[in-house]
Each structure stands twice: as structure tokens, then as C-alpha cells.
């Protein structure tokens, strides 16, 4: 059953509103510039998590903390462009990054000007979430090949109060929902200790070997572009895996190809937003992994073209 509020109705003929894109861009700016604290729940097919997220800007750099409120204490801290992870039973570590991936939905950090040629931003109206009046906006791909979002944005602060990720049938895959929040400079003051804390060392991630591949997809959804490629030797298989990573600024997927083995098999699996599609063709195992509907993943896989080795 869809989690979309039954009280929210909108016309199927609603047209894209240019001001909706501007509002979404304001949400992007507010989320990264204000001092605030959110208590929220994250709901998906695996269950419900209760979390707290704090964000401030100190000395012109972002400082943020994500804390799991139930069960074992899991904490993620951002200072500048370094993200540190603390979890029971694991050695703490730090990675480079622009924001805490598991905090606010990725949509919040998106450049909506870049998305505008490929997505419609549709104003749905206004409703209340967390006792706040919110603008409601749908973010829908124009070509119908991707998932969509509905955003409930506080009209005053422009912070997201609720974000639903929907599949192509309108079923809710994930929901971010704020329970309570605070916006004031005291949030920044309470985070001063994090600004001075000793964080774990930066973990170096080995880069894959750059290479020219003899394959490429002949079709990908409009707006996606290749952002990296690599060849890696994985411990679980004997042959190297060649990978291309694509993104449209909102969703991403990778195309991974290795020589087929006796253990290779075809499969199509979707868990929440993530689809894994594996096919065998021309003695190669083609695996699409990413935030795509299964039908789109299959179309990309079927479009892979191999050229003769030089």
C-alpha cells in the first residue's frame, strides 16, 4: 500500500511550474546553509529507522552529525569535506565526501537547474507536515524511465519536511519524514565540540586501473552521462571487472562486465530503490546495478554493444 497521504489530491493534468524548480533550488541552499536540527524517521521495505540530524556552518565550512536513535549507537560526523563513521564492532574511519549520504534524501543536494531539461517540477499545492505549512512538489522524469519524488517543503525555512521516493506504479519505495525540528544559531553552538574533536584517519580508497573498453551501452536515459570508469580485480571472481558509472545528478547506476564463468547466472532483483540485473551474452556477464526501475536496467543491458578487440 502506498504511503502517500490519502488527503493529498492533485490533477493528473497538472503542468510543470517554473517557480517549483526555483523553490527546490531554495531547498538545496537552505539545507546546506542554515543551522538546524531534525528528528526524523526513514521508512523503506526493510523497516523504520529513527534518526537525528544536526547541521551548522562554522568558519565557513559545513559541520553535521547523524545519529541513530534506537538500538546500537551509530554515528556519522561531517567536518568540511571529510565524513567519519562510528559503529559498534568496527574500527572508525573517514572518507572524503560533500555530505552525509544517509542523512537527508539525495534529492535535497541536487542541482535542480541541471535536472530541468529532463525532469518536470509539478506544483501539487500545500498541506501540513510536522505542524508546518508545506509546499508540495512532484519531481518526475519526462521520459518515464526513472523513479519519481514527492517533496513536502516548509514554506518558511524551505527545509524538507517529507520526501517520498515512488516507483513507476506510484508505490512508495522510501519515505523521509520529519517529526520535529529546530532552526537557530544555538544548534551551531552545541556542535562546537565536534569542530575540535579528533576524527579517525582518512581511509585511502584504491583507484581502479583506467582503461579503454571494447564495449559501451548504445542507449541510456536522457540526461545521464558517464562520470567514471575502471577495471578492478575482485577477490570473489578470478577475472577482472570493467565498470562504467553514470549519473543524471539525481540517480546513478553502473554497468559492470566480466568474462562469464560456470557460476554466472541471469537474475533480476530489486530491493527498494536498487535494482541488480545480470545477463549472459557473448561469453560476458553484464550486470547493471543502480537506482533504476527493472525495465530500464534491462533496456540498458540489452543495448550493450561489443566491438572487436584491436
Identify what each model region corresponds to.
Residues 163, 283-291:
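Short, well-ordered beta-strand elements
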Residues 85-110:
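Acidic/charged, solvent-exposed loop-and-adjacent secondary-structure segments enriched in E/D, K/R, S/T
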Residues 130-198:
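Gly/Pro-enriched, hydrophobic low-complexity segments
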Residues 15-89, 119-127, 132-136, 140-148, ...:
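N-terminal mature ectodomain segment of secretory-pathway/periplasmic proteins
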Residues 9-11:
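N-terminal signal peptide c-region/cleavage motif recognized by signal peptidases
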